[in-house]
């Protein structure tokens, strides 16, 4: 009989109750849907196999206790011991779940028998997803790289549980192409009473998995928790129980059981459009959201504008539509259609007061575009100098301006399609502004400065602090770009007027 396994807490174990899910709730990530959508899609984009756009499917479904009871065997007593309220859910006949599946991706690669991370970081996602916490095989150049994104799934489940199904591409990868399946739960430390009157205390982590001896390596012959493989019926049982679409296509499928009522189809559609509308509009991503009745919405480059227009009317809705239009306009520009500022002297501390950044001719071009109500694109060169090798690599960001009927609007920042939603930047008057960071060098620099929720940049993160020349100053320089570009252009006109007045 298949059952869940939890490890008894030993004398050397810490009394640890995980809190990682709490880090994904911020001012701009207000709903469970936002957490799941932002984390899952950024991981899917990072896992792009290179064969074309990434496709992600979210589905909301209903499960019954009778049809899924075997998948939860041995779990409920641990859930109830950890959280009495969550344990009561075992008596309910029906429950809601959400599935997240990606296609056009690599799946969780790596040897499933690598229980200690000996295979290193490269192409070893299975180890980092299943066996590691707070560690990742990614770098700052990728959209997510803290190794805790999976906790958004666990946090969304009222029993802190998920099921994982993955298939891998390639010609005979170690551990096979799959599909591989495993259940994971992260509860609290909990105590279970035994019939003899004694009790056992268990650590938070539980698995629905095979426990069998390893077949090779330094730990050959020792028992380990391993996923169910293609020779087991478990991948098919999980697929059938939760109506997963994956057969043997490379990629990752995650099931989040027992989700709360507020995680709905409408919230998922709204969150995808809000957080990834620009990336979808570019053609790099397509998303389908399916509800409990089979009704679905597809968000792709052909439909994203219509989906945005179909959202509930609000200032945010119009803002998203205008941002999409501005971003798509900017994406098609050539060098002669944008203004490229000068390179900042490397020996000077980053400052928008530096004279060589903007010529008088460029300032006039910017003012003329603003006066005529046209869209405007400005490219800003940014030097990246890691202390590790002291070699400067020039990168850039693009700022797009467009007319707005709103008096003052806050600039919005996108790093490789991900909306960095809480960047503190001064508002601009009468204009909409987007800062687009797609170049890998600057994306890696700023990605290293992001926390686990990827909503702001800070020079104090462990992956950023002390790693770059003038690192903190360049972050401030990027934040201030929209306001400072306009200030420089307008101050040049004021200087010109003063000179004319003096001559007169």
Range-by-range predicted roles:
Residues 51-61, 66-74, 162-212, 223:
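Flexible phosphate/Mg2+-sensing switch loops adjacent to catalytic phosphate-binding sites
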């Amino acid at each position: 009989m298949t059952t869940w396994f939890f490890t008894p807490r030993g004398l050397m174990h810490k009394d640890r109750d995980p809190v990682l899910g709490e880090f994904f709730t911020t001012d701009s990530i207000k709903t469970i849907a936002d957490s799941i959508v932002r984390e899952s899609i950024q991981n899917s984009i990072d896992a792009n196999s290179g064969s074309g756009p990434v496709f992600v499917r979210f589905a909301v479904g209903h499960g019954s206790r009778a049809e899924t009871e075997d998948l939860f065997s041995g779990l409920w007593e641990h859930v109830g011991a950890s959280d009495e309220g969550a344990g009561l859910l075992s008596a309910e006949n029906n429950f809601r779940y959400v599935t997240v599946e990606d296609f056009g991706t690599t799946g969780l690669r790596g040897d499933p028998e690598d229980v200690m991370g000996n295979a290193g970081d490269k192409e070893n996602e299975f180890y980092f997803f299943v066996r590691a916490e707070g560690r990742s095989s990614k770098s700052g150049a990728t959209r997510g790289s803290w190794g805790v994104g999976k906790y958004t799934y666990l946090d969304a489940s009222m029993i802190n549980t998920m099921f994982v199904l993955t298939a891998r591409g390639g010609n005979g990868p170690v551990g096979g192409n799959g599909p591989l399946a495993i259940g994971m739960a992260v509860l609290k430390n909990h105590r279970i009473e035994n019939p003899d009157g004694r009790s056992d205390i268990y650590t938070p982590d539980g698995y629905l998995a095979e426990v069998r001896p390893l077949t090779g390596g330094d730990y050959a012959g020792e028992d380990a928790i391993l996923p169910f493989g293609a020779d087991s019926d478990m991948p098919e049982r999980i697929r059938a129980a939760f109506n997963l679409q994956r057969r043997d296509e490379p990629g990752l499928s995650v099931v989040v059981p027992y989700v709360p009522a507020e995680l709905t189809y409408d919230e998922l559609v709204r969150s995808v459009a809000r957080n990834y509308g620009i990336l979808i509009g570019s053609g790099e991503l397509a998303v389908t959201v399916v509800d409990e009745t089979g009704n679905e919405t597809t968000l792709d480059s052909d439909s994203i504008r219509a989906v945005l227009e179909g959202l509930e009317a609000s200032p945010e809705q119009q803002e998203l539509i205008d941002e999409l239009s501005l971003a798509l306009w900017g994406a098609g520009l050539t060098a002669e259609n944008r203004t490229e500022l000068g390179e900042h002297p490397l020996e000077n501390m980053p400052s928008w007061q530096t004279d060589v950044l903007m010529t008088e001719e460029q300032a006039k071009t910017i003012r003329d575009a603003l006066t005529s109500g046209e869209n405007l694109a400005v490219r800003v060169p940014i030097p990246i100098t890691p202390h590790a090798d002291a070699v400067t690599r020039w990168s850039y960001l693009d700022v797009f301006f467009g007319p707005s009927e709103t008096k003052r609007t806050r600039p919005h920042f996108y790093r490789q399609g991900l909306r960095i939603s809480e960047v503190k930047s001064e508002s601009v008057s009468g204009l909409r502004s987007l800062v687009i960071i797609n170049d890998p060098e600057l994306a890696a620099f700023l990605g290293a400065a992001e926390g686990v929720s990827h909503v702001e940049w800070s020079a104090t993160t462990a992956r950023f602090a002390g790693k770059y020349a003038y690192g903190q100053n360049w972050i401030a320089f990027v934040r201030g770009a929209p306001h400072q570009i306009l200030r420089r252009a307008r101050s040049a006109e004021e200087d010109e007027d003063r000179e004319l007045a003096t001559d007169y």
